[in-house]
Amino acid sequence: MQIILLQRIVNLGKLGETVDVKPGYGRNFLIPLGKALPATKANIEKFEARRAELEAEEAKEVAVAQERADALTDVNVIMRAKSGDEGKLFGSIGTRDIAEALTNSGLEVDRAEIKLPEGTLRQIGEYNVDIQLHHDVTATILVTILSEDGDNEDLDEDNAADENEDYSEE
């Protein structure tokens, strides 16, 4: 089944492309959700008439996402969690926890936008976390996890080791 994409779809194509998909995927998912149109002559003409409007909407979405990304630059989220002697957390810090911490600090981020490719965070330390606000716009924030009981010797030792490595290279 050939369809015209009305928006970018990951692993399928960009706005305006005509692509082949399985009939069920097109009929039951893409077309009912307004993400695509069947590629008939009438729909192709109708799409070409709306192309500028759809591209303008896409540009607005990118601009809004870029503004949000600019607001997230240099954000450092500090979270406290219970941990064992070796810095291993009892439990883990996931996307929901990070989204909640960002919301509490006044920045609206949906948990689906937070990307943790290696899974949840399970150790005390500093982590760079990507937030994908749009398929073209990604922001990176720093998440620092500290021990809830105030014993952050592992983090301090790691920082001291990093500083010593920096000085030894010079």
Curated annotation (Swiss-Prot):
Entry keyword Zinc-finger: no
Disulphide-bonded residues: none
InterPro entries associated with the record: Ribosomal_bL9, Ribosomal_bL9/RNase_H1_N, Ribosomal_bL9_bac/chp, Ribosomal_bL9_C, Ribosomal_bL9_C_sf, Ribosomal_bL9_N, Ribosomal_bL9_N_sf
NCBIfam families: L9 (TIGR00158)
Gene Ontology BP annotations: translation
One GO CC term, this protein: ribonucleoprotein complex
Name this protein carries in UniProt: Large ribosomal subunit protein bL9
Any GO molecular function: rRNA binding
Keyword check for rRNA-binding: yes
Name of the gene encoding the protein in the UniProt record: rplI
HAMAP family hit by this protein: Ribosomal_bL9 (MF_00503)
Region: Disordered, residue numbers: 149-170
Superkingdom of source: Bacteria
Keywords, sorted A to Z: Ribonucleoprotein, Ribosomal protein, RNA-binding, rRNA-binding
The protein's role, per its UniProt record: Binds to the 23S rRNA.
Classification lineage: Bacteria, Pseudomonadati, Pseudomonadota, Gammaproteobacteria, Moraxellales
Family: Belongs to the bacterial ribosomal protein bL9 family.
